[in-house]
Amino acid sequence: MEVLMAKGANLVFHNKVIDGIAMKRLISRFIDHFGMAYTSHILDQVKTLGFQQATATSISLGIDDLLTIPSKGWLVQDAEQQSFILEKQHHYGNIHAVEKLRQSIEIWYATSEHLRQEMNPNFRMTDPYNPVHMMSFSGARGNASQVHQLVGMRGLMSDPQGQMIDLPIQSNLREGLSLTEYIISCYGARKGVVDTAVRTSDAGYLTRRLVEVVQHVVVRRRDCGTTRGISVSPQTGTIPEILFIQTLIGRVLADDIYKGPRCIAARNQDIGVGLVNRLITFRVQTISIRTPFTCRSTSWICRLCYGRSPTHGDLVELGEAVGIIAGQSIGEPGTQLTLRTFHTGGVFTGGTAVHVRAPSNGKIKFNEDLVHPTRTRHGHPAFLCYIDLAVTIESEDIIHNVNIPPKSFLLVQKDQYVESEQVIAEIRAGTSTLNFKEKVRKHIYSDSQGEMHWSTDVDHAPEFTYGNVHLLPKTSHLWILAGRPHKSRVATRSLHKDQDQTNAHFLSVEQRYISNSSVINAYMRHTFFSSDLSSTNSNKGDSISDYSERKRIVRTRHSNLIYPAKNSYLLGKRRRNRFMTTFQSIQELEKELRAPSGISIDIPLNGSFRRNSILAYFDDPRYRRESAGITKYGTIEAHSIKKKEGLIEYRGVNEFRAKYQMQVDRFFFIPEEVHILPRSSAIMVRNNSIIGVDTQITLTTRSRVGGLVRVEKKKKKIGLKIFSGNIHFPGKTDKISRHRGILIPPGRGQTKLKNWSYVQRITPTKKRYFVLIRPAITYEITDGISLSTLFPQDLLQERDKVQLRVVNYILSGNGKPIRGISDTSIQLVRTCLVLNWDHDKKSSSIEESRASFVEVKTNDMMRDFLRIDLVKSTISYAGKRNDPSGSGLLSDNESDRMNPFYSIYIYSKARLQQPFSQNNETVRTLLNRTKEFQSFIILSSANCFRMGPFKGLKYYKELDPIIPIKNSSGPFGTSLQIANFYSFYRLITQDKILVTNYLQLDNLKQTFWVMKYYFIDDNRKIYNPDPVSNIVLNSFKLNWYCLHHNYYEETSARMGLGQFLCENVCLAKNGPRLKAGQVLIVQVDSVVIRAAKPYLATPGATVHGHYGEIIYEGDTLVTFIYEKSRSGDITQGLPKVEQVLEVRSLESISMNLERRIDAWNERITGILGLPWGFVVGAELTIVQSRISLVNKIQKVYRSQGVQIHNRHLEIIVHQITSKVLVSEDGMSNVFLPGELIGLLRAERTGRALEEVISYRAVLVGITRASLNTHSFISEASFQETARVLAKAALRGRIDWLKGLKENVVLGGKIPVGTGFKGLVHPSSQHKSIPLKNKKKNLFEGEINDILFYYREFFNIEFLCFKNYQ
C-alpha cells in the first residue's frame, strides 16, 4: 500500500475539462511516451469510463428543456424596424438594391448572433444543468448552432446555390415555423434525402478521383539523390509559429544547417521536436527541406522525400502506399463536413465589420485634408481615409485620441458632437489575396409599367454599340414615369401627337383613342393653398377643347423655349424637361401680326450688377427678320460686340468692354432660304440647279423663294440653301469676275443695279464658274432711340450718380450666317440699357449695384417700379443668405445703418382700368395704349387680385409663405401665368401693404424667342392684346419667402419644370408631402406631378432599354455587378477544393499567378537565353503553381478546423503539375506536338538524345491526369473504357503493371507491403547517386548551381516560404 502511495505521489493531477483539442494533445503525448500498443489500451479504458458515466447520468432531452431567450421579442422587433426604414430608403431611391441586400443581411445576422450570445448566459443563470445546455457545450456531434435554432431563431437561410434568401426565419423550432418559413427552410436547408445523397456522393466522388490519380505512388526507394528543396524561413512572420512547427516536424533536411562554422543539423536528417526547438533557439534564417515536389523518382517516391510516417513517428517503410493514404486524407474530411452541414441546416453566416466607438461624449476633431467623401457599402455617406487618421474627441475635462487605421470609413463629420459608445468609424476587413471572391450579377426588375428616363449621361457598352445595353458612368437615378400603353381598337386617325397630354374624362366622353406610341400620364395634383381652380373644358361634340397641335419641337440644353403656331395653339416640350400650355383661340387671329414691342429687364439671380452692365434690352421691330440670311457690315471690317471677347460675363451679367465698341452706321442683310433635312430625306432638286417659287424640294417641303440651290451633305444631316438673285456669266474682261464676297452699291457696274447687291462666286466645276448677284437689304442704325423715347419722362427720376445710357449692337458677327427656325423671327439689332455710375470720390469704392422689380399695391391699385441700389464692395453684403434681391426688402432705417445706398426709381404708368373685386375675374388689358411702348410687366388674371384686410396677427402666426389667392384661375385652370417667369418675394409689413418683388429669371444670353400670350375672361372669349415679345421661358425655379416685421423668412425647395422629385419632398411649410414624380405644370398655388418611381444605380451598372422606352411590369431595368465573399460553409468549400484540383479556372487558382509566371519567363529567358529559357521557365511555372495550389486547398480546410498535413496535398498536387505540353515539332521522332508527357521524362529524353525539347508547363485536373497515366488498364477502369482501350490497341501501348489498380484488375499481386519485397532488387535499394557523378551533364550541373546555390542573384521568391502555409 505504501509503495502504491509513493508511486501516486509522483503523478500530476489535472482538474480540467478535456475538449477535443486537449484530447488530441493527450493522445499524442501517450504515443511519444508509451508507444502505440500501450496508448490503445489506455484509450479503451477512457472509452469504457465515458460509457459508464453517461449511463449513470442518463441525460435525456425533452421539449420542456428548450428554454426560449426572453430578449428575443424586442430584438426581432428592433430588426424589423430597421428593415422597414431600409425598405423606405430604397423606395425613396436613396439606396440601391445591392446596398439594401447587404444591409438586410447584416441586420438579421447581427440579431441572430446577439441571440446566440445571449443563449449561454441565459442557460447558465436559469438552469445550468439543463440537458440542452450540457449537450451543446460538451463537444459532441451537436454544436451551439443547432441549439440556437432550437431556442433562438433560425435566421437567414441559404438556397441550394449558396445565395442568401432575403426573408429571415424569425421563429425557432421550439415555437414552430409558419408555412412560409417551413417552405423556405425546406428550400434552403438541404435536408432532402436526394440532396443529401447527392452532396455525400460529391464528396465520395472527389475521394475516388483523388485516389485514382495517386494510386500508383508507393515508397520504393530509400533516397533519390536530389539536392533540391523548399526553403522555409521562420523569420518572415507571415505564418504562425504553430503552423511553422507542424510544417517542419516529420520532414527531412535537404541541406546542412550551419550556425557559424558549426554544423547543427546534417543533410538527410529527419526533423523531430527536439531539432525544431534547437533550430528556433539558434534563430536559423532558412531551412531547406525535402518534399514530394523535389523527388526525382519518375512514378513513385523515396523515403527521405516523404519523411516520417504519421502513424508511428519513424521514417516511412518501403512499400507503403502513401498515395492512397494521401487521397483518403483529403477526401474523407469532405464527407464528414458535408454531413455536419446537413445537421446545421444551411443557416447563412455573414460577417460584421469592426467598429470604432467613441470613448466618451465630446466634439470630434480631425484633419479634413486627409479624408474625402465617399459612400459606404450600405449607401450611407462617410469619409474614407487613406492613411492613419488621428481623431480627437474633446469633452469638458479630458481629450481622447483615437487612431483610425487606413482604408477605414469615418461615419461622423468634423465638429460633430458624439455620445459615448457611438460608432464613429468602421474598419474594413483585411483583404487577403487568398480570399475567395466571386462576381455576382443582380438584376433589378420593374415593379410597374411606364416610360424609362434617366438623369445623367449614359455610355454605350463597347460590345453592344448598336444594342440597348448602356453603362452608367456615375451614380444616378433611373426613373419609370407612370403610364400605360393604350392601343386603339377603332381605326380612326388620331389628332394627338406623341406624348401630347390629355385627360381621361375626354377619352371617356368623346370615345377617342390615342395612337400606339402615346402614353396616358398618371397625374397627382397637389394644391398648396386654398384656391378654387375651375376647369373650362368644353363638352361640344365637334370641338376638342384642351388639345394643342404640336407644330414643332425645339430642343435646347438649358431651357424650355416656346413659340406659337399660326393658329395660336401653344406647346413647348423637351424630352427631359417637359412643359405644356393649353391656351386656345376659338376664333382665328388677324393675319397681320402687330409689331410686338416691349422692354425685357435682364436681372441675374443674385440681382448684382457691375459697371457697364446691361440692365435691360429692347428689340426694335424694324430690325426683325422672318427668314435666314447673312449679316454684312459693309466694306469695312467691323467686330460684333456680341462675340465672346466683346461681351464678357461676370456672375451671370453681360458687360461691355470699351475697346470693342465700334461705330457702325449701316449694315446689310443678305436673305436666303435654309432647310436642314435628315440624311435619309429624298431630295427632289439637284445641286447648283435653278428653281422657281413653290417648287417641291422634298415630299413635304416646298420652296418659298426661287433661285439657285446649294446642297451640303454632312454626317447626319443635309443642308439645303436657296439663294435668290441673278446669275451672271462673266467674260475675261468683266470687272465683276474680279470681285467675290463684296457689296456693290446701286448704280455701279455694267448692270446698273438699283439696290445694294452682294456678289458671290459659285464654282460648280473646276473649269467653269459663274457669279451670283444677290440682293442685299440695307439697315441704317440711328441714334434716335433714347431714354425719353423708351420711357415717358415722368417715369425717370434719376438720383445721385446713377447713369443709364442706350447702346445699340448687332447680334451676329460679320459674314456669319443666321439660321432661323420655323416661324420664329430673327432679331438683328438689339438696343440695350447700360447701367453705370460716376467715378467720383464718394462712389469710387462702389463696384456693384443691386436691382430688383417691386410692385406695390395700395388702395386696390398697383404700381410697378425698378429699384437700383449701389453697394460698397468694402462692406460685406449684409442681406439674408437665401435672399437674392438683398436689401431691397429692408427698411430705409435699417439699410442706412448698414450701408449708404443710392437709389433710382423708375415708375410705371400701367394702371388697372377698373378695380378688382374678390369675385370679379374679368380681365381687361393692362396697357396704356396712348404710349408708344408698354410697361415692363403684363399680369394675367391669377396675379391681379384684391386682398382683404388682415385679421389681427393670424397670418403672422401661421407664417404662410404665400398669401391665399381668392378665386383665381388662369386659362382653363391649368396654364402657366406670366408671373411664373419671376421669383416671388412678398413682404407683409405692419402697414398692411403687400409688396411683391419680381425677379426675372433669365439664364439665356444668346438666343431670344418671340412668344405671345392671351387672356381669358369668364365668358371664355379670347382676345389678343399687344403680345409680349422676347420673354425667355426657362426651367422655372420658384423660391418662396415670407417676411414679417421681425424679418422672419422661410425658404422651400426650388422646383423646375421637368424636374424629378423624390418622395416625401415638402415644398411649403404645412404643405403636402409630394409623391415621387416629374413636375409637369407649375402654378402659383398648385403643381401637377406625373407619378414616377426612382431606382438608384451605381457606376458600372448596365441599363437595359433606351431613353423614353416603354417598360412593362417585370422587365429588366438594370443589372448590378458586385463582388461578394463566398460563404465559409463547407458546401461551398468542397466545390472550391474540387475547382482547384480540377484546374477549371485560373483566376480561382491564383489571382496573380499568370502575371508572376509571365514575368519569370521573361526574366529567365532574357538571362539564360532561349534554349534554357524553356526548361527553366517551365520549372518556375510548376513550382509557383504547386505552392499556390497547396495554399488554396489548405485555406478551405483550415477554415473548417480540419488539419491536413501538407505532404498529402503535395503528393496530389505533384501529380497534376508534373505534366508538360510539347509545343514545337523539334523532336518529331519521339513526341508529337501537343502531347502530354511527364516533366522528368522530357528532361531525360532530351539529355539522352542531346536535343532541346520545346515544351511549356500545363496544369491538368485530377480527372485528366487520371486519364493520362502509364497504365491504360487503370485509365479504362476509371472512365471512358471503350475509348481508352481502343486507343491503346491502335497505339500498341504496353502496361508494365506498376500501380496497384491494374494489378487488382488483373488479379495479380499488388506491389505494396509484403508484395513489394519480390519486385525490388537488393542492389538498387542502397545505391546512392551523388550529385558529383553527374557533373558531366551540362544541364544537371550548371542549372542546379545557378538556381539553387546562387538564389540571391535571381531573387527567386518561389523557393521562399512566404506564402507556403
From Swiss-Prot:
<dbReference type="GO" id="GO:0003899">
    <property type="term" value="F:DNA-directed RNA polymerase activity"/>
</dbReference>
<keyword id="KW-0862">Zinc</keyword>
<dbReference type="InterPro" id="IPR050254">
    <property type="entry name" value="RNA_pol_beta''_euk"/>
</dbReference>
<feature type="binding site">
    <location>
        <position position="302"/>
    </location>
    <ligand>
        <name>Zn(2+)</name>
    </ligand>
</feature>
<comment type="subunit">
    <text>In plastids the minimal PEP RNA polymerase catalytic core is composed of four subunits: alpha, beta, beta', and beta''. When a (nuclear-encoded) sigma factor is associated with the core the holoenzyme is formed, which can initiate transcription.</text>
</comment>
<dbReference type="InterPro" id="IPR007081">
    <property type="entry name" value="RNA_pol_Rpb1_5"/>
</dbReference>
<keyword id="KW-0804">Transcription</keyword>
<keyword id="KW-0479">Metal-binding</keyword>
<comment type="function">
    <text>DNA-dependent RNA polymerase catalyzes the transcription of DNA into RNA using the four ribonucleoside triphosphates as substrates.</text>
</comment>
<feature type="binding site">
    <location>
        <position position="224"/>
    </location>
    <ligand>
        <name>Zn(2+)</name>
    </ligand>
</feature>
<dbReference type="InterPro" id="IPR012756">
    <property type="entry name" value="DNA-dir_RpoC2_beta_pp"/>
</dbReference>
<dbReference type="GO" id="GO:0003677">
    <property type="term" value="F:DNA binding"/>
</dbReference>
<dbReference type="GO" id="GO:0000428">
    <property type="term" value="C:DNA-directed RNA polymerase complex"/>
</dbReference>
<comment type="similarity">
    <text>Belongs to the RNA polymerase beta' chain family. RpoC2 subfamily.</text>
</comment>
<feature type="binding site">
    <location>
        <position position="305"/>
    </location>
    <ligand>
        <name>Zn(2+)</name>
    </ligand>
</feature>
<dbReference type="InterPro" id="IPR007083">
    <property type="entry name" value="RNA_pol_Rpb1_4"/>
</dbReference>
<feature type="binding site">
    <location>
        <position position="295"/>
    </location>
    <ligand>
        <name>Zn(2+)</name>
    </ligand>
</feature>
<dbReference type="InterPro" id="IPR038120">
    <property type="entry name" value="Rpb1_funnel_sf"/>
</dbReference>
<dbReference type="GO" id="GO:0006351">
    <property type="term" value="P:DNA-templated transcription"/>
</dbReference>
<keyword id="KW-0934">Plastid</keyword>
<protein>
    <recommendedName>
        <fullName>DNA-directed RNA polymerase subunit beta''</fullName>
        <ecNumber>2.7.7.6</ecNumber>
    </recommendedName>
</protein>
<keyword id="KW-0808">Transferase</keyword>
<dbReference type="GO" id="GO:0008270">
    <property type="term" value="F:zinc ion binding"/>
</dbReference>
<keyword id="KW-0150">Chloroplast</keyword>
<dbReference type="InterPro" id="IPR042102">
    <property type="entry name" value="RNA_pol_Rpb1_3_sf"/>
</dbReference>
<dbReference type="Pfam" id="PF04998">
    <property type="entry name" value="RNA_pol_Rpb1_5"/>
</dbReference>
<keyword id="KW-0240">DNA-directed RNA polymerase</keyword>
<dbReference type="GO" id="GO:0005739">
    <property type="term" value="C:mitochondrion"/>
</dbReference>
<keyword id="KW-0548">Nucleotidyltransferase</keyword>
<dbReference type="Pfam" id="PF05000">
    <property type="entry name" value="RNA_pol_Rpb1_4"/>
</dbReference>
<dbReference type="GO" id="GO:0009507">
    <property type="term" value="C:chloroplast"/>
</dbReference>
